[in-house]
Design a protein with these regions (language model features):
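N-terminal adaptor-interaction module of cullin-RING ubiquitin ligase components
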Residues: 1-285, 298-301, 319-323, 347-348
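C-terminal capping region of solenoid repeat domains
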Residues: 2-46, 50, 72, 178-180, ...
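Eukaryotic basic, amphipathic alpha-helical target segments in cytosolic regions
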Residues: 123, 139, 143-147, 167, ...
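Short, flexible helix/strand-to-coil boundary loops that buttress conserved ligand/catalytic motifs
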Residues: 139, 247, 311, 336, ...
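Short catalytic-loop micro-motif centered on adjacent basic/acidic residues
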Residues: 147, 232-234, 256-257, 310-312, ...
Length: 522
């Protein structure tokens, strides 16, 4: 028997068993080996052809065929296997080598978007868009909010391809036609507008300062097609036709800020049945003026029954319009009046807002000059917060009626209101459930007037007094001092001296001048 032979290990078997019989009879094993070789192999580029200057390498004679043992049989591979693995180099258990050095290109768009979305810094995200055109397009897909300044960027369609996934669009600045050569001077209109540069001959009551209504309506139709998932929109000078087309294409719109609003436009607003937050600006003194009356408020209330927050700025109306809002919008929780032009008697309609939790009056020259009898006012039983900011509070009966309607509030904020004296502020005693009181910028209220109010608030837990110059530290009585001691939270900075002394504690800045002038004394 030859040394390369395979002896039969089974004595009961008559014929000897060799390796060739094992491979030929077991086809599954052969296929498994072939597939394993394919999986572990990798392709390499063929070597470059030799240059014509260099002589070809000498060919070595093929090695003589080796004499195989008589009982060992060579199994030829299939033609398909030979054709597939022609010019391959097989290295067992070697990692796959990528011929290109750009491993990021192997990532899918979804994976890279998830990585880029985890970056906390917005400036870092913007710089990433400069890496390549691919990253530039991906960065545009991550943007959710846009404020349009260049109207041509919108009308040309570039915004739709650059930012395909927007849910928040602000068209206010782009809707105003401003002068490009008057950059140094501007007209500031508050937080909503910011600075605008408008020529004196262009700025006129004929609305030549704004984009035409038909242009805005055509843009709204494009937005309805491009962004069906739009959730927030700020626009100016549109019509009910454009709003109705937007309502059909964007059924999930939840928040809208509508400038230059009037009764006719509110027919289109009523088409947004899922609207939850709405801000209507009817008139801004010196900029534009439009009419929002009880008719428009009634149309709005009947169409947008899911409103949670409503702000009326520069809007007219009366008892009927506010009552319609309270009866139809049962989910309304926050109501804001900014610079209102309401007729007398509207205050008693607030009692129809049964689920109202926050009432804000901002920049109001008056509240309600003729509120009516106390028994007709009613009350907002679930109201928790009352905020008065930059209002004129010099009418005692008007403020008293407001406190009667809001007598169940737990938080009261009075900021930068003029005309408020001790006698008028005394009506705050009607709100006996107040736990948090914040008074700021009320220069005519004295320490005595504050004491007469806070001592009647038996549930008071927190007090903030800021920039009220008629309140003095040395005027605090022992009773008021004991009340301060029992509060959970107290912030007492009635004048600028108190603010400055509090901010300079431990710095020593307030004493250096005194040492200097002592040296100059003779």
């Amino acid at each position: 028997m030859s040394s390369c032979s395979v002896e039969n290990q089974n004595p009961n078997h008559s014929s000897p068993l060799n390796w060739s019989n094992l491979w030929l009879k077991n086809k599954k094993a052969l296929d498994h080996v072939s597939s394993t070789i394919r999986r572990r192999s990798f392709y390499r580029k063929p070597p470059p052809p030799p240059t014509p200057q260099s002589p070809p390498p000498p060919q070595q004679p093929p090695p003589p065929p080796q004499q195989l043992p008589p009982e060992v049989t060579v199994v030829p591979l299939s033609p398909h296997f030979q054709q597939t693995h022609y010019n391959e180099t097989l290295l067992p258990d070697s990692p796959e080598v990528v011929p290109s050095h750009d491993f990021i290109s192997l990532l899918s768009d979804e994976t890279l978007l998830q990585i880029l979305s985890k970056l906390p810094d917005r400036s870092q995200r913007n710089s990433n868009s400069l890496v390549s055109k691919w990253w530039f397009n991906l960065q545009g897909r991550l943007v959710r909010s846009v404020r349009v300044f260049d109207w041509s960027f919108l009308t040309s369609g570039r915004m739709f391809t650059r930012f395909p996934n927007l849910i928040d669009i602000d068209l206010l600045h782009g809707s105003v036609i401003s002068s490009s050569h008057l950059k140094s001077c501007g007209l500031s209109l508050g937080r909503e507008f910011g600075p605008f540069c408008i020529e004196s001959d262009v700025f006129s009551p004929n609305n030549h300062t704004f984009r035409p209504v038909n242009e805005v309506d055509s843009v709204l139709k494009c937005l309805a097609t491009a962004y069906p998932n739009l959730q927030r929109l700020v626009l100016l000078n549109s019509s009910e036709i454009g709003l109705l087309s937007l309502a059909e294409g964007c059924p999930n719109l939840q928040e809208m800020v509508l400038h230059h609003c009037h009764d006719q436009i509110l027919h289109g607003i009523a088409g947004f049945t899922n609207l939850q937050i709405l801000k209507l600006i009817g008139t801004i003194d010196g900029f534009y003026s439009s009419l929002v009356s009880d008719i428009g408020l009634t149309i709005l209330a009947q169409g947008c029954r899911r409103l949670v927050k409503l702000e009326l700025r520069g809007c007219e109306g009366s008892y009927d319009g506010i009552r319609a809002i309270g009866q139809c919008c049962q989910m309304l929780e926050e109501l804001t009046f900014c610079d209102h032009r309401m007729d007398n008697g509207w205050l008693s309609a607030l009692s129809y807002c049964e689920n109202l939790k926050t009432l804000r009056l901002v920049s109001c020259k008056t509240i309600d000059q003729i509120p009516g009898l106390d028994e007709h006012l009613g009350a907002c039983r679930l109201l928790e917060r009352l905020q008065l900011e930059r209002c004129r509070l010099c009418e005692k009966e008007s403020l008293r009626a407001l406190f009667l309607v809001c007598r169940s509030v737990k938080e009261m904020v009075v900021k930068d209101c003029w005309g408020l004296t001790d006698g008028i502020f005394l009506n705050a005693n009607l709100c006996r459930r107040v736990k948090f009181l914040w008074i700021e910028g009320c220069s005519r209220v004295t320490t005595e007037g504050l004491e007469s109010v806070v001592l009647s608030l038996k549930e008071l837990e927190s007090l903030k007094v800021i920039s009220c110059k008629n309140m003095k530290d040395d005027e605090v009585s022992p009773v008021l001092s004991m009340l301060f001691y029992s509060l959970k939270d107290l912030k007492w900075m009635p004048d600028n001296r108190s603010v400055l002394s509090t901010s300079l504690v431990g710095s020593g800045m307030g004493k250096r001048g005194g040492k200097f002038f002592k040296k100059l004394q003779i």
